[in-house]
Structures are given as C-alpha cells and as structure tokens.
Amino acid sequence: MGILSSIFGLMGCNAQTARFKTVDAKAFAEVIADTCVVVLDVRTAEEFQAGHIKGALNIDVLKSDFEQKATSGIPEGKTVALYCRSGNRSKKAANALAPKYKVIELGTGYIGWTKEFGTR
C-alpha cells in the first residue's frame, strides 16, 4: 500500500493538473500486487487473447460503450490500474475514468511490460 500512498500523495501536489498517474512497468507491478486494485486492459479482445497481464479485465476503450461498461462493473472510488499496447489508448481510458476512480496508467503499455517481465 506504500506505493499507492506515494503515487497519490504526488497527485495531491498537482491536483489541478494531474487527473491520473502514469508509471513504468516496475511501479505498475507494485500497484497491481494489491488485490484491491482493478487491473484493466483497454486493448481489443483479439489483443487481449494474444496475451495480457494476469488478472486483468478486458474492456476495449475504442468501443462506444467503454465508459458505460467500465463504470457499471467497477465500484466508484476504486483504484484502477490500466494499460493498452503502447500507452496511447490507455491515456484516453485514464482521462475517461479519472473523475470516478483513482487511476494508474502503465505508460509503456503491454510492450513495456513484456520487455520488463516477459509474458508471465
């Protein structure tokens, strides 16, 4: 829980500009080690099936019902750790979810995750 406190403590310093926190693969791994954190893969179903972070839920950010699916399935106020392939789509998802959740985004995406940890 220490990493979450550190991350959100930093966000508090820039509350007007920071809507979510972008982290690298190592910090993301520490965040998702907390079983209370919801891990969200925002890539397509095909990308998800080809490989994903263990325990992740898949909701495609490019689908028109992304926000409705995410907000109906995740209780408000939860910490949501999300990622895409390279870090582009996840920023779109992070912006959409930040008003209702504590959002951590994997800036390097699944590509960075697999470079750091392989496809475990």
Question: Over which residues does each language-model region extend?
Answer:
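Structural scaffold elements adjacent to functional motifs in cytosolic proteins
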Residues: V39-D41
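Short, surface-exposed ligand- or partner-binding patches at beta-edge/loop junctions that are enriched
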Residues: Y83
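Rhodanese-like catalytic fold shared by cysteine-dependent sulfurtransferases
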Residues: G2-A29, V37, E46-T79, N88-R120
